[in-house]
Regions:
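S-adenosyl-L-methionine-dependent methyltransferase catalytic core, i.e., the SAM/SAH-binding region
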Residues: 1-162
Length: 162
């Protein structure tokens, strides 16, 4: 896939977008936090309401390209941070957010780009990291102790017999 960000941007449809919009009522303005920016579906929809501001986060450095378009289109209304959503508190701080949205799960951009190493269908290296600067699965398997791998699989993989 030559340009995974453009394909994600045009093909990703956020889960339950209209239901989220209905519940959040962005037409009245406010600050909305998109903790899993990805292709920008939620952020773009919230920004259609002229009184809204969006703070968006994504740990994947490829996503920055998509965010730049929105920063240009919505100056002083769209703010992107290349960070993990677990850091949302340090980013939002004491600002009162009207809603915080998480579209959890793997991103299409990561699954569809074979170089990211999430698929067993290709001969690419095993990466499986959410961001490009993180430790790959291949590095973890080759460098972590057996005990550490068991612990990771047991806790994060919820596999009690690891």
């Amino acid at each position: 896939m030559s340009n995974p960000t453009s394909s994600l941007e045009s093909s990703h449809f956020p889960v339950m977008l209209e239901e989220v919009i209905k519940i959040c009522s962005p037409g009245q303005g406010g600050i909305f936090v998109d903790c899993t920016f990805g292709g920008g579906g939620y952020s773009k929809r919230f920004l259609k309401f002229s009184k809204t501001k969006v703070i968006a986060l994504d740990r994947d450095s490829l996503i920055k390209k998509i965010s730049l378009k929105l920063e240009k289109q919505y100056p002083n209304r769209f703010f992107f941070y290349q960070r993990k959503f677990s850091e949302v508190n340090s980013i939002v701080g004491n600002k009162l957010a009207d809603a915080i949205i998480f579209d959890l799960g793997l991103s299409s951009i990561q699954l569809n780009d074979l170089k990211r190493g999430f698929s067993y269908r290709s001969k690419e290296k095993l990466d499986m990291s959410m961001g490009l600067t993180e430790t790959s699965a291949e590095e973890a398997l080759n460098n972590l102790t057996e005990q550490k791998l068991k612990s990771i699989i047991k806790i994060l993989g919820e596999e009690k017999d690891a």
